[in-house]
Amino acid sequence: MIWKRHLTLDELNATSQNTLVAHLGIVYTRLGDDVLEAEMPVDARTHQPFGLLHGGASAALAETLGSMAGYLMTRDGQCVVGTELNATHHRAISQGKVRGVCLPLHLGRQNQSWEITLFDEQGRRCCTCRLGTAVMG
């Protein structure tokens, strides 16, 4: 297991109360040895005006996953902040849920890189993201 902080899924989800994460309906669903996953509904909260998943909502899910994964890699007295987010949209989604899978690309002392892939309910890739974070403290 790569994580330096040991939280349960319930504890991870409790951190989202009264935040954008909760408003968008994002829920952490899996914390594996080197992977963090979450789901987000594709509904009125996350749609753009034409009834499709908003690219900004996809980016919010990706940044949420990468930032929390980054936090799990810090020690007491440290935190992470996002420095760069890139998202490539591959497929539109109009309903259901989108699942995000976050894996490390680079875990340095001062910076981290995370790959977050979003999938529709049929398991098709709909967005590929990369988040860079800086370790503070």
Swiss-Prot record:
Entry-linked NCBIfam families? PRK10254.1, unchar_dom_1
Q: Cite a single Pfam family from the UniProt record.
A: 4HBT
Question: What's one GO BP annotation on this UniProt entry?
Answer: enterobactin biosynthetic process
> Out of the domains of life, which is the source?
Bacteria
Cellular compartments per GO CC? cytosol
Report the family membership. Answer: Belongs to the thioesterase PaaI family.
* Pathway(s) it belongs to: Siderophore biosynthesis; enterobactin biosynthesis
What CDD domains does the record tag this protein with?
PaaI_thioesterase (cd03443)
Broadest EC class assigned to this enzyme: hydrolase
Q: Which residues form the active site?
A: E63 (nucleophile or proton acceptor)
Q: Does the keyword Acyltransferase apply?
A: no
Keywords tagged on the record: Cytoplasm, Hydrolase
Query: Subcellular localization, per the record?
Result: Cytoplasm
Q: Which stretches are annotated as coiled coil?
A: none
Q: What does the annotation say about its assembly with partners?
A: Homotetramer. Dimer of dimers. Interacts specifically with the aryl carrier protein (ArCP) domain of EntB.
MF terms from GO for this chain are: 1,4-dihydroxy-2-naphthoyl-CoA thioesterase activity
Q: What is the name listed in the Swiss-Prot or TrEMBL entry for this protein?
A: Proofreading thioesterase EntH
In its UniProt entry, the species of origin is given as Salmonella typhimurium (strain LT2 / SGSC1412 / ATCC 700720)
Q: Does the keyword Repressor apply?
A: no
Q: What does this protein do?
A: Required for optimal enterobactin synthesis. Acts as a proofreading enzyme that prevents EntB misacylation by hydrolyzing the thioester bound existing between EntB and wrongly charged molecules.
Q: What is its EC number?
A: 3.1.2.-
Main location (coarse class): cytoplasm
